[in-house]
Amino acid sequence: LLGLGCSPYVVSLLGNDHNGNTMQEMFADLGIRNELFYTDHPTITKTRVIGNSQQVVRLDFETENECLNEETEQKLLDAVKRALPEVDIVVISDYGKGVCNDTVCQQVISASAGQGKKVIIDPKGTNWEKYRSATIITPNLKELSAVSGMDVRNEDKEIHSAADRILKEYNLTSLLVTRSEKGMSYIAPEVSQDIPTEAREVYDVSGAGDTVVATLAAALAAGIPI
């Protein structure tokens, strides 16, 4: 988002450790506004092993315990509500690590709607009840299949059928389904569009989903219609 000329405002949790301090320093150096709260859990760290310009394996360092107690949850929500008047759009990036629970997601979606702010969600898992009434969700094909309970093949008709069911079930405004080499499909009640890719030699797919979400957020925040 920063690279696209936006001024992001980050609200999240950090471990009180070296990696957490490094992230704070990076945000400060880049001038990224943030409210980052320290917890007793270590900062989740991902190490990518690269060979011949391609990712070979990724090592994740984290704990399995819930990182969000009631006090921290309230701090997080209060921070989001303070940030809302200063932003044009809200992105919930859910990595399934315990921060984006049902309460947090629903309160953020509700508070954003109350101020007329669109909410984009990069989802994780099959519990989409917590994303109810979001503006747009960006699942990949595997995630679409899992949440719909259907074995969805990478074909326009099957993707649209599954997406239509999900839109109605969770009262969503739209879905943007990423489809690897077949591009993306945008599905909303009144309009749908399949967007093909242009062939490129891919060296590293890391962050492809994040790039889609960031570009979408920047465009919508600038008032560009889908």
Name these PLM-found stretches:
Residues 2-91, 103:
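Conserved N-terminal subdomain of the carbohydrate kinase-like
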Residues 11-13, 50, 92-95, 122-124, ...:
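Generic beta-strand/beta-sheet core signal
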Residues 44-46, 68, 146-149, 202-206:
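Short, charged, surface-exposed secondary-structure boundary motifs
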Residues 54-57, 182, 193, 214:
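Glycine-centered loop/turn positions within well-structured domains
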Residues 62-65, 149-153, 200:
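Short glycine-enriched, charge-decorated loop/helix-capping segments at active-site entrances
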Residues 97-192:
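Conserved phosphate/ATP/ADP-binding segment of small-molecule kinases
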Residues 169, 173, 198-226:
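Conserved post-catalytic alpha-helical subdomain immediately downstream of the catalytic base
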